């Protein structure tokens, strides 16, 4: 018997091959991650269970050894951080055949890019929101342990104390807060809302050639990049938190061990043809957990939005 025609082949059905969608989604997802690349990341992929146990040993202290005496034993009880992996987010589209047939090929590129953007934004938002618990904070949108960006020390009180513009003195004071807590200098970052970047570009110390030494196209005035500030890379994210006072925005200065991101299921892309609807269901999803790891390793600061 002759082979039936027409056939659905790999060429004619290429738009339904999951691997193509998946590759494009993962690329877009990685492009839109800011916070996830700046914190401690632990892979939970392929492992069963819903909770990750991370040992958190207490630092010991040295004791003076006197002659003819026994050594001093350290009897600390070690603790652990529990990361519950319960953040399961998905992005789905239902694409009818008539649209698939008549639409430009760019439609798929838009959906995959949009899926990557949406999932990446959600991951970053989950991590950024952990900043409300730094320095013993309540973990709410009140940000009761945040400081004012202007001086880096005055407590922020949502609803009664407005955020202030970021200053060089404020940055240096927050650096001292981390230094006083013995937070390692290597691995620190600053994440700002766009308004924070706007303010920093107006601070001569961070932009003008006489201070930073950059000339030509390497100067911040020409390229808009802040780059390295006192040994910390500066990143801008529109996902920066908005506290309960909606006119303010929250920035973070932190070490990578302030937060942990545990990923059990990386971005997965799937398609399923629904013949009864003559349409294709497309879904991208991810499963992860986030947690504050070291409370003293970061500072949240409030600025005017």
Question: Can you annotate each of these PLM segments?
Answer:
Residues 46, 65, 74-75, 85-87, ...:
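Generic, well-ordered alpha-helical segments
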Residues 270-305:
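Extended, compositionally biased alpha-helical segments that mediate assembly or anchoring
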